[in-house]
A protein has these predicted regions:
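Conserved adenylate-forming
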Residues: 49-54, 156-169, 173-215, 227, ...
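Structural core segment of the AMP-binding/adenylate-forming
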Residues: 8-10, 51-52, 79-151, 476-478
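Conserved ATP/PPi-binding loop(s) of AMP-dependent carboxylate-activating enzymes
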Residues: 352-356, 364-399, 434-436
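Conserved AMP-binding/adenylation subdomain of ANL enzymes
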Residues: 194-213, 221-261, 276-277
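Conserved AMP-binding/adenylate-forming core of the ANL superfamily
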Residues: 21-67, 71-75, 92-97, 148-151
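Flexible, low-complexity linker/hinge segments
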Residues: 1-4, 119, 139-170
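Gly/Ser/Thr-rich phosphate-binding loop
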Residues: 257-265, 274-345, 358, 365-371
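AMP-binding/adenylate-forming catalytic core of the ANL superfamily
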Residues: 91, 97, 108-110, 263, ...
Length: 533
């Protein structure tokens, strides 16, 4: 028996056909239908792909928000033998052009409000022949060869048989950002996605169940929304999809109204949720957990949700290359006997490897670091569901060693094997030959009651080569300044760790997936310091 994505959808359609999928529409209303409907519409679409000149093996791009139509594409495309290529809609035009040309996509399925991107770049796309607008009708557009999604599937076959595909058939594709150069492509097979899904649903991983109501805020264009759409279909869990441009008030209103039990979002969204809940509390009594990722979650955020709302924040670690999960927080039986607030020092860490994951932390000489929570090394990891190469990219040579992916993430390991992410290798600050963790400084700054968000980067220094510079976003009405921030940090760190500069700013730049954009901060820090002098 081959491991196929079709098995995930067929299970929910057969055994939980009436379970709901809810989508927030652009006008704020809610669209509701069921797994029975999802299955029929995905088959309708699969039966119509050939009419667009799309055949097994072709790459097909999506450029869309988290909606029911995008959810249908998650199954219709790979189950028809094509490759679901989710494209980050927040990328610069030149990166979108590069990605679509490099992957040789045959068509693009795009939400109506995102059409302007393709109106600007259509002339540069070499292989895209058709644009399918995810709507009832085609809006006014200058694009050629455009069809409306509902027109396309109207005459499709709701009982179209999905193919029995070899499990190593490519099923999905994402591009991951690169430290330098253009994004790198990662291919997922049916086997990869199936194994990752089953692992994610395990009790000691995310514990996804049919009784759950899931809200993936993490975009469906980013690492398969951390696998949650596939996990929901596998277990038949109710899905709540937040639609276009979700922000904290909308997310929290959905959590309250739909009785969400588990949600997943970037840490920056979690910080925004805290601020919104302080402004206007909600009833979140249905929640059993909130997964935050993309960067280290501040302990203060975890404490807020636990103390004020009674549910924990889950942490994990992974990447696009890992499909994406590789580790997950684990609260062992001894720790479970203690009050939940005492779990936070473990929850702020990145957990232990998921079943099936092999992970090692190596020093600069390629030797395993001791499990003393002090020695720092780079994480190397491999799983049965992770990639071993980049798509048509020579950077594979530097990115993988003996089947292990070189993550570029620096970590220490506790005596019981729990990862503590110290920093990205490129984000560590080397001052006078000694390493300083930007993550530790950021977490301490965010624990100040008047600080909403913080980022620490290296600023050039004539004597020490690099010194920490802190960018700080304060809470509304805050009066805290550099002197008080330094005093807040002094008891927590050695003197030479303390930032030399504290810049109070209105906002910190983010990447397309909500992470702090430290590359941008490093590029602007010298100018910012000159202007603040």
């Amino acid at each position: 028996m081959e491991l196929n994505i079709r098995l995930l959808l067929e299970r929910s359609a057969k055994y939980f056909p009436g379970n709901e999928i809810v989508t927030r529409l652009p006008d704020g209303s809610l669209h509701r239908y069921t797994y029975r409907d999802l299955d029929a519409r995905a088959r309708r679409l699969a039966s119509r792909l050939a009419s667009l000149g799309i055949h097994p093996g072709d790459r097909v791009a999506t450029f869309a928000w988290n909606t029911y139509r995008h959810f249908e594409l998650y199954f219709a495309l790979p189950c028809a033998g094509t490759v679901l290529h989710t494209v980050n809609l927040r990328l610069a035009d030149e990166h979108v052009v590069y990605i679509l040309n490099h992957s040789e996509d045959r068509a693009v399925f795009v939400d109506p409000d995102l059409l302007p991107t393709f109106e600007r770049i259509a002339g540069e796309l070499k292989t895209v022949k058709t644009f399918v607008v995810l709507a009832d009708r085609v809006p006014p557009t200058t694009l050629p060869n455009v069809v409306a999604y509902e027109d396309l599937i109207r005459d499709g076959d709701p009982e179209f048989p999905f193919q029995e595909l070899p499990e190593r058939t490519p099923a999905g594709m994402c591009y991951t950002s690169a430290t330098t150069g253009m994004p790198k492509g990662v291919i997922y097979t049916h086997r990869d996605i199936y194994l990752h899904t089953i692992t994610e649903c395990l009790g000691d991983v995310l514990d996804i169940r049919e009784r759950d109501t899931l809200l993936p805020v993490v975009p469906m264009f980013h690492a398969n929304a951390w696998g949650l759409p596939f996990a929901a279909a596998c277990m038949g869990a109710k899905m709540v999809l937040p639609g276009e441009r979700p922000h904290a008030p909308v997310i929290l209103d959905l959590m309250q109204a739909e009785r969400v039990t588990f949600a997943a979002a970037a840490v920056s969204i979690g910080i925004d949720m805290v601020a919104e809940l302080k402004r206007q509390p909600r009833d979140l009594s249905s929640m059993r957990g909130l997964m935050l990722g993309g960067s280290a979650t501040p302990a203060a955020v975890m404490e807020f949700f636990l103390k004020d709302y009674g549910f924990p924040v889950l942490t994990a670690w992974g990447s696009t290359e890992m499909t994406p999960l590789a580790t997950c927080v684990h609260i062992g039986r001894e720790l479970l006997q203690k009050p939940a607030i005492e779990h936070i020092p473990t929850r702020v860490r990145q957990g232990i490897p998921c079943p099936g994951t092999e992970l090692k932390v190596l020093d600069e000489h390629g030797r395993p670091v001791p499990w003393d929570d002090q020695a720092i090394g780079e994480i190397y990891v491999r799983t049965p569901w992770s990639t071993t190469e980049y798509y048509r990219d020579e950077r594979t040579r530097d990115g993988f060693v003996d089947g292990y992916w070189k993550s570029g993430d620096m970590s220490a390991v506790s005596p019981d094997g729990v990862l503590r992410l110290v920093d990205r290798a490129k984000d560590l600050i080397k001052s006078g030959g000694e390493w300083i963790s930007s993550v530790d400084l950021e977490n301490a700054l965010v624990s100040h009651p008047q600080v909403r968000e913080a980022a620490v980067v290296a600023a050039p220094d004539d004597k020490w080569l690099e010194r920490p510079c802190a960018y700080v976003v304060t809470e509304p009405g805050a009066t805290v300044g550099p002197a008080e921030l330094r005093a807040w940090l002094e008891p927590k760190f050695a003197k030479w760790w303390l930032p030399d500069h504290y810049l109070i700013v209105d906002a910190i730049p983010k990447t397309g997936v909500g992470k702090i954009n430290k590359r941008a901060l490093r590029e602007q820090v010298e100018q910012d310091l000159r202007q603040s002098a």
